[in-house]
């Protein structure tokens, strides 16, 4: 990441981070593009494939990614034991071959994502079915589906009345078998090479849009009948239609490929859209605003062309991408990287930027139009928190709720609307032990239901807390400058580092620029921070925490 990008980001991170924001990655299994390269052919190779996936997910977690879009149906083939379609070759290297030994790649991925507090959505490639001689395509032809072949591969005919219930059955199978958080429909449209409407036998633009919408509706109805909390989404072409001042240049969702995605939002057939906005300049910004303006109070997550950072794919600079991320966040829009490899390989420093851009944890947006089913947690003992002499704390609570979000702050009561106070998301236990905890840290817990709706917060009981008897030890400041503690003079200071509560670096200050033991903090927004000092031997010392509160 360039020095200028780091400076711009540092300035940006002093702002309050969004508590609700989808931060997603598409993990492509097609041809193992993002999927582990070790084939699962033995117990040992299964372990290697699992470890590769764990390493990928660990990188997501370190960057505070909260949503994984995992390609579960590839090209009429799957990455799980399906009763409907054959195995994809990305798992074992051979199409139709099961890995054996009880290994279920999708089941494993669901478990590992949830361990990390991340949602996992099953990405379904709908209309493409691969090469005409592939096992998946041949299987569909034997079942009597109409298949059309182009230079780019073979495709289901969206006008075939059997397509909608068939694709719905696949999505239904996944939702029944797995605790996925969403179904993400890809290529839910007419293929690029499909002939223009003939206006014969009902082949009109309106009828084509109706054909695609019928497939979407069938999948929606099947999924919601099984688990109504599973999010329905799709990835439409990045430009919905021509705008009054900006042309889509003859490639848009509504008119070119028969995707009326904004209408699906209006009808409630989609909870989210991930438009594939792999464009720059006037081909991006007016169109992301158009998606937001026509979201009908549902969620938009902009699909980023991260792969263009690789010179073999395009000529984008990191600045091209980061500007889109800044603007989308200001519009209240989440972001999704296409693809995983280009993010985790840190092309042009994009992974480093992602980690800093996501300075705090965040929750995916809650589902609209539902009533909360979560029960507020309550303390097991007199207080939520038990503090021990070894500086560890144990949080204990009870409730009948699938998830809990854990918050912490140096102020009481803990502000659970501030993302900077989020410590854990989608936690599934009812006991949490933490070691080496600052004695001035307060805690709170909120339950969360399957729809993402939170309960009121359970705060710790101050009457029974040792905190109420402890003197404040926060570093003194007036909102503009912070007085460095005496200990700072003893450290051979080289630089001071200001961090968020979660440990993300927000500011690095050269010690030579500090005058009269006063550290400038005027550009920080109100909130809680910690301060470290590094000496010339690069050894670090924690100087303490401080609160910026300037008043109204």
Show which residues each predicted segment covers.
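Beta-strand-rich modules
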Residues: 410, 434-454
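Aromatic-lined carbohydrate-binding/catalytic grooves of carbohydrate-active enzymes
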Residues: 63-100
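Polysaccharide-binding and catalytic clefts of secreted carbohydrate-active enzymes
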Residues: 65-66, 73, 116, 134, ...
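Active-site-adjacent "subsite" loops/lids of carbohydrate-active enzymes
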Residues: 20-22, 26-51, 121-173, 177
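Catalytic domains of carbohydrate-active enzymes, especially glycoside hydrolases
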Residues: 48-77, 177-180
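C-terminal tail/sorting-segment detector
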Residues: 466-469, 484, 528-552
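Substrate-binding cleft of secreted/luminal carbohydrate-active enzymes
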Residues: 261-262, 266-284, 301-372
């Amino acid at each position: 990441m360039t020095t200028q990008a780091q400076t711009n980001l540092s300035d940006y991170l002093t702002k309050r981070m969004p508590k609700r924001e989808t931060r997603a990655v598409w993990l492509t299994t097609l041809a193992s593009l993002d999927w582990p390269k070790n084939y699962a052919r033995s117990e040992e190779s299964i372990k290697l494939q699992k470890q590769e996936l764990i390493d990928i997910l660990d990188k997501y977690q370190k960057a505070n990614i909260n949503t994984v879009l995992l390609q579960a149906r590839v090209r009429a083939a799957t990455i799980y034991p399906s009763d409907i379609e054959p195995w994809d070759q990305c798992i074992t290297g051979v199409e139709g071959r099961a890995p054996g030994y009880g290994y279920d790649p999708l089941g494993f991925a669901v478990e590992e994502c949830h361990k990390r507090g991340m949602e996992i959505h099953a990405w379904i490639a709908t209309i493409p079915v691969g090469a005409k001689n592939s096992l998946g395509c041949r299987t569909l032809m034997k079942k009597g589906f109409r298949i059309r072949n182009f230079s780019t591969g073979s495709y289901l005919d969206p006008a075939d009345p059997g397509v909608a219930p068939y694709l719905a059955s696949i999505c239904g199978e996944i939702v029944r078998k797995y605790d996925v958080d969403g179904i993400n429909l890809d290529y839910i449209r007419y293929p690029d090479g499909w002939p223009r409407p003939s206006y014969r036998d009902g082949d009109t633009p309106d009828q084509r849009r109706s054909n695609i919408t019928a497939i979407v509706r069938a999948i929606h109805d099947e999924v919601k009948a099984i688990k109504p909390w599973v999010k329905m989404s799709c990835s439409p072409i990045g430009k919905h239609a021509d705008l009054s001042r900006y042309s889509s240049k003859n490639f848009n969702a509504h008119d070119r490929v028969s995707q009326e995605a904004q209408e699906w939002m209006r009808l409630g057939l989609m909870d989210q859209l991930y438009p594939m906005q792999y464009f720059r300049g006037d081909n991006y910004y007016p169109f992301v605003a158009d998606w937001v303006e026509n979201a009908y109070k549902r969620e938009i997550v902009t699909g980023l062309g991260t792969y263009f950072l690789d010179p073999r794919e395009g000529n984008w600079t990191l600045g091209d991408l980061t500007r889109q991320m800044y603007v989308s966040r200001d519009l209240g829009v989440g972001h999704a990287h296409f693809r995983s490899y280009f993010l985790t390989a840190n092309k042009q420093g994009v992974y480093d930027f992602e980690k800093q851009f996501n300075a705090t944890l965040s929750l995916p947006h809650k589902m609209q139009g539902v009533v909360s089913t979560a029960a507020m947690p309550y303390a097991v003992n007199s207080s939520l928190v038990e503090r021990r002499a070894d500086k560890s704390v144990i949080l204990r609570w009870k409730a009948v709720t699938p998830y809990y979000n854990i918050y912490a702050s140096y102020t009481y009561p803990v502000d659970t609307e501030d993302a900077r106070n989020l410590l854990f998301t989608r936690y599934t236990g009812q006991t949490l032990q933490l070691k080496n905890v600052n004695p001035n840290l307060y805690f709170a817990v909120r339950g969360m239901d399957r729809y993402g709706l939170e309960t009121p917060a359970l705060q710790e009981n101050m009457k029974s807390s040792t905190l109420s008897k402890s003197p404040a030890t926060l570093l003194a400041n007036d909102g503009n400058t912070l007085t460095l503690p005496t200990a700072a003079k003893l450290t051979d200071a080289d630089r001071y580092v200001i961090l968020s509560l979660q440990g993300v670096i927000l500011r690095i200050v050269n010690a030579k620029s500090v005058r009269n033991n006063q550290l400038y903090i005027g550009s920080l927004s109100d909130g809680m921070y910690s301060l470290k000092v590094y000496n010339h031997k690069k050894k670090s010392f924690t100087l303490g925490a401080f609160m910026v509160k300037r008043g109204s």
